[in-house]
């Protein structure tokens, strides 16, 4: 059925289209933290996230990364390939920050000699727990070969993103990716890439990401607008 709500999320809603293999993603003006425990409506946020993510995914597509992104169709909407989402959040850390610093008792801002890839089990009831490769296999999420692919592809994407953000004066601290199986059973990058799911610091150490909301550091949309303008100029 066309235009049927398939999924209602914290930051995005997903609808069916005339093509059973294509979905319409609508970005919402909502910011959340602590797995939705704190919610706030922020005018214009959805459009900024959509435009930033569209620009990043277009560049990833051109760089040869297989993604679900098809095209942006309005300021807060885009068309994507339908995928079966793998219930893992794949996190890559270039610099210590956030929950990593709290978990291991290290200060924020330490550059990691080798970027660290982590898995988190996508399960709201369990608060998305940190898990390892053995847990992933025990839960039957993906196999050894697919785990290796997820890690390798995440590292490849990191190298591309670090380079692009460095060109616009931003340091990519860490980020979260989601992947899914397309209709042919191939793993492709899904979800979004925006300051909602990454940390970006400018040369002065200012936060240019969702930490502005988490830590009450200022106006979130002003910061996202700066990131968007920098990416447009790239």
From Swiss-Prot:
Pathway: Purine metabolism; IMP biosynthesis via de novo pathway; 5-amino-1-(5-phospho-D-ribosyl)imidazole-4-carboxamide from 5-amino-1-(5-phospho-D-ribosyl)imidazole-4-carboxylate: step 1/2. Keywords: ATP-binding, Ligase, Nucleotide-binding, Purine biosynthesis. The keyword Nucleotide-binding applies. GO terms for biological process: 'de novo' IMP biosynthetic process; cobalamin biosynthetic process. Transmembrane segments: none annotated. Pfam families: SAICAR_synt. GO terms for molecular function: ATP binding; phosphoribosylaminoimidazolesuccinocarboxamide synthase activity. InterPro entries: SAICAR_synt/ADE2_N, SAICAR_synt_PurC, SAICAR_synth, SAICAR_synthetase, SAICAR_synthetase_CS. It is an enzyme of class 6 (ligase). Its EC number is 6.3.2.6. It catalyses: 5-amino-1-(5-phospho-D-ribosyl)imidazole-4-carboxylate + L-aspartate + ATP = (2S)-2-[5-amino-1-(5-phospho-beta-D-ribosyl)imidazole-4-carboxamido]succinate + ADP + phosphate + 2 H(+). The keyword Protease does not apply. Belongs to the SAICAR synthetase family. HAMAP family: SAICAR_synth. This is Phosphoribosylaminoimidazole-succinocarboxamide synthase. The lineage of its organism: Bacteria, Bacillati, Bacillota, Bacilli, Lactobacillales. The gene is purC.
């Amino acid at each position: 059925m066309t235009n049927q709500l398939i999924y209602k999320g914290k930051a995005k809603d997903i609808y069916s289209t005339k093509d059973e293999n294509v979905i319409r993603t609508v970005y919402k003006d909502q910011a959340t933290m602590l797995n939705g425990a704190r919610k706030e409506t922020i005018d214009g946020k959805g459009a900024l996230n959509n435009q930033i993510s569209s620009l990043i995914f277009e560049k990833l597509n051109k760089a040869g990364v297989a993604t679900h992104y098809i095209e942006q169709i309005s300021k807060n909407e885009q068309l994507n390939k339908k995928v079966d989402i793998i219930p893992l959040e794949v996190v890559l850390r270039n610099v210590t920050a956030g929950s990593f610093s709290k978990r291991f008792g290290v200060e924020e801002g330490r550059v990691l000699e080798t970027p660290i890839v982590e898995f988190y089990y996508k399960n709201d009831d369990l608060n998305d727990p940190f898990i390892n490769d053995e847990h992933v296999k025990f839960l039957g999420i993906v196999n050894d070969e697919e785990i290796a692919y997820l890690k390798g592809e995440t590292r490849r994407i990191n190298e591309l993103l670090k380079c692009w953000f460095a060109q616009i004066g931003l340091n990519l601290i860490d980020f979260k990716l989601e992947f899914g199986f397309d209709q042919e059973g191939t793993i492709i990058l899904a979800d979004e890439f925006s300051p909602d799911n990454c940390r970006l610091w400018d040369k002065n150490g200012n936060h240019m990401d969702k930490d502005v909301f988490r830590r009450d550091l200022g106006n979130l949309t002003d910061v996202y607008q700066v990131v968007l303008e920098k990416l447009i100029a790239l």
